Amino acid sequence: MTSRSRQAAYSGIFINETTGEFPQKEQELFEGIVAVIAVVILTWMVFWMRKVSRNVKVQLEQAVDSALQRGNHHGWALVMMVFFAVAREGLESVFFLLAAFQQDVGIWPPLGAMLGLATAVVFGFLLYWGGIRLNLGAFFKWTSLFILFVAAGLAAGAIRAFHEAGLWNHFQEIAFDMSAVLSTHSLFGTLMEGIFGYQEAPSVSEVAVWFIYLIPALVAFALPPRAGATASRSA
């Protein structure tokens, strides 16, 4: 584990432990703010991936070849670029996991985090040593859609946290009750709650925020890239 990875992990532990020291309302407010930050970061990441997914493989290969051909200093610059890129993703993961942990204090979110880390290690090994080929465009597309649904759940969770903190008390009627169909006490319901923020009996405001975020995000994601951006990439 790199020093930046350790720093990100320690930061996540510190933040998670600190929330337990807050009074209940302040803790809910903190959780809501963390969820909003996570939504912003994840949304930015999705549209960044959408922007670079078309030519990212070719651009990366060209940049690596150019850096390695210029000498040792450029090689170290490449190493540091990868280092800070991984550190940045680690910090994003801290906020993402913290927001997920705040929604469910059971064993499933930590277990999911460990399984995700193990899966990343296996895929990294296969990519580096196994020589498997990955269609980055398709990979970014489907993972981006997945992340948008995760972010929508976090947005709904944020409005729920703000209500519990006493900041938002509008439209708190129960929109529907799915407990008879998919209870959060079931295995699949717990999994959906931990990943997508599923609630068996959400309030009207939670459902509204979920749709208000997700529909424009999906429409913006489905729109073709701007002509200027496409031309600049092809140039």
UniProtKB/Swiss-Prot annotation:
Protein localization: Cell inner membrane
Entry GO MF terms: ferrous iron transmembrane transporter activity
Highest taxon above the source species: Bacteria
Keywords annotated in UniProt: Cell inner membrane, Cell membrane, Ion transport, Iron, Iron transport, Membrane, Transmembrane, Transmembrane helix, Transport
A Pfam family of this chain: FTR1
GO cellular component: high-affinity iron permease complex
Record-annotated membrane-spanning stretches: 29-49, 78-98, 107-127, 139-159, 178-198, 204-224
Matches recorded under InterPro entries: FTR1/Fip1/EfeU
Keyword Magnesium tagged: no
Cytoplasmic side: 50-77, 128-138, 199-203
Coiled coil (UniProt feature): none
Membrane as UniProt keyword: yes
Bilayer disposition of the protein: Multi-pass membrane protein
Periplasmic topology ranges: 1-28, 99-106, 160-177, 225-235
Function description: Uptake of Fe(2+) ions across the membrane.
Self-association state and partner proteins as the record states: Part of a ferrous iron transporter composed of EfeU, EfeO and EfeB.
Sequence similarity: Belongs to the oxidase-dependent Fe transporter (OFeT) (TC 9.A.10.1) family.
Designated name of the protein: Ferrous iron permease EfeU
UniProt source species: Shigella flexneri serotype 5b (strain 8401)
UniProt lineage: Bacteria, Pseudomonadati, Pseudomonadota, Gammaproteobacteria, Enterobacterales
